[in-house]
Amino acid sequence: MKAHPKEMVPLMGKRVAAPSGNPAILPEKRPAEITPTKKSAHFFLEIEGFEPNPTVAKTSPPVFSKPMDSNIRQCISGNCDDMDSPQSPQDDVTETPSNPNSPSAQLAKEEQRRKKRRLKKRIFAAVSEGCVEELVELLVELQELCRRRHDEDVPDFLMHKLTASDTGKTCLMKALLNINPNTKEIVRILLAFAEENDILGRFINAEYTEEAYEGQTALNIAIERRQGDIAALLIAAGADVNAHAKGAFFNPKYQHEGFYFGETPLALAACTNQPEIVQLLMEHEQTDITSRDSRGNNILHALVTVAEDFKTQNDFVKRMYDMILLRSGNWELETTRNNDGLTPLQLAAKMGKAEILKYILSREIKEKRLRSLSRKFTDWAYGPVSSSLYDLTNVDTTTDNSVLEITVYNTNIDNRHEMLTLEPLHTLLHMKWKKFAKHMFFLSFCFYFFYNITLTLVSYYRPREEEAIPHPLALTHKMGWLQLLGRMFVLIWAMCISVKEGIAIFLLRPSDLQSILSDAWFHFVFFIQAVLVILSVFLYLFAYKEYLACLVLAMALGWANMLYYTRGFQSMGMYSVMIQKVILHDVLKFLFVYIVFLLGFGVALASLIEKCPKDNKDCSSYGSFSDAVLELFKLTIGLGDLNIQQNSKYPILFLFLLITYVILTFVLLLNMLIALMGETVENVSKESERIWRLQRARTILEFEKMLPEWLRSRFRMGELCKVAEDDFRLCLRINEVKWTEWKTHVSFLNEDPGPVRRTDFNKIQDSSRNNSKTTLNAFEEVEEFPETSV
């Protein structure tokens, strides 16, 4: 299986492996015997065990038969010698007549020339159909053609004959795409031929040139076809173990039309669950485990990408992730950022891979020498109680693209409510709320409540309509200093709100409409309310009576915005969510259907009414389109009547249309709306706690962004811990009680249980690291492969 190509025998005049595995002997020829008259037809009759009519081995169609190995291609240029994946030619042998000048002799020569031109097609057909004897014959024929050329042209000529010009696919790739019982033997013969003619390096590392599969090599195909023996043979023969397949088929943008695996052979083996090949590649001295693809992803990024939501897939991904990380022993492999600035941990959060995210966050390695690869450390344990330290690297908001921010703000993932229940995210948010967020939330509520009270009082005691609008600074007994201060406070606070919410809206991605409708709606309503207040003030300054319309709308919207502060309480936080979801999911759809009915029936009824005389007081209320629409709307809410006016052209038809409209809208649509709203409320109630936690998490992060940098550093969570030699991490301590799990074989950072003096993160200096905790008392049993605990 691991035979080196130098151990393989050349094809001509030496031993060649027969299909059955027993080598056949080619007798060495004298120079005079090299070119017999019927060489092309009867050369292999001299080979022991050769059969004139070999049985073609039938193969099963390959997995990628259409995208990578199409057997039908139209020859447009007429140069069918360069066609990819040629059809099987007829190999009938034409006997050469005795008279070389006869017409039959000329036809025979022409047939021989056509066979030479079809040599590439015949080689590709032989390797795809598993015809070993025919392949050997064709390679000998190809080698004879090479003797007529200059030595410097031979390598290029051979590569041209062994490679499809339109796709860059070699006959070696063709053989691997059509697996059959003779594939391994065919690969050996091709490698031996390439080595004998000094083209092994070019031949084995040839890449696809077609855009869809650009960069794919024979090693990639062997791994994808799960041919471990052939993959080992190619690696031993010098295949490039760091080749990158960059075609569109392997691009994650087209994941529904292709397969993304990270481009490299190692990543392909890992993503397709082939641990033997992964081990073989990692043991190879030329394999670059830290290699990154064109998107900046390394092998761990690729594993996160292929993970799915079902258990079987996640189990093998976690095993591969574990195996690669532990065998490499390189902590930086997990901290590498791709072109989007995401580590494998952050990528798992962005893609909503909850199981993989949980595994990475809580990975605890029990072996002492590899403890630095953990993200969870057991500080001490006593019975069922243990104190765990969770690494906050790339988790807290102190870093860009933190897991916490990605999870809270990414509306493209449906399970972010579930992801926020994972540790340490759950405890981290709870500690932030207790430390500063709840106090800021209460102050914000007080200020906004006082703002609404002041706005209401100022609006209520405004000059009435019968009075002239006074100058704003004309302080009389009716308008004193208190009212002026109230108006100034309302104006200043409204300007502050408009600036704050305007910046927040500007920072939102316009393309993320779902985020705006689901999470960021309060930014818009607060901004609109503040703008209405400012607009009413300026209209009042210039003595426009229209200021009252803006003022009334601002008051109504201001008190409605108080629902935002219900998210501070779990029992009341559902009201705003229910109202939001009912409006966006149910009411908008109802209004669309209702407006269609309203306009249609309004036009119909208005068309049935004749023009009324001006002196007729009993004129129909359906005399115009606008009047008809208004009357139909009254019928919808139960305020209209079904009286028939005398001036309708067809009273029976008029009545029929009214009754139909009432049935469709008042009876059918309204009851459907009520049913849909009830279903929405029920669904929200089932996820009430998770939705409320997501609301509160977004509120916490919004308030944290408002803090200045010096204050944010004071409120930073975690403690600096020494987890290994010269390895200090900012960790979050979580005490856990597990009656089903006893920490008997886990290495502890401290022998003695109980609380210890925590290091204040804000007071740590570089010199204080020598005074950090003394660690590394272990009780584990050293094993060949360290276990992990999730």
UniProtKB/Swiss-Prot annotation:
Official protein name in the record: Transient receptor potential cation channel subfamily V member 3
Membrane topology (Extracellular): 461-479, 541-545, 609-620, 647-649
Keywords of the record: ANK repeat, Calcium, Calcium channel, Calcium transport, Cell membrane, Cytoplasm, Disease variant, Ion channel, Ion transport, Lysosome, Membrane, Metal-binding, Palmoplantar keratoderma, Repeat, Sodium, Transmembrane, Transmembrane helix, Transport
Result, substituting N561A: Impairs channel activation by tetrahydrocannabivarin
The keyword Lipid biosynthesis is assigned to this record: no
MF (Gene Ontology): calcium channel activity; identical protein binding; metal ion binding; sodium channel activity
Topological domains annotated Cytoplasmic: 1-430, 509-519, 567-569, 687-790
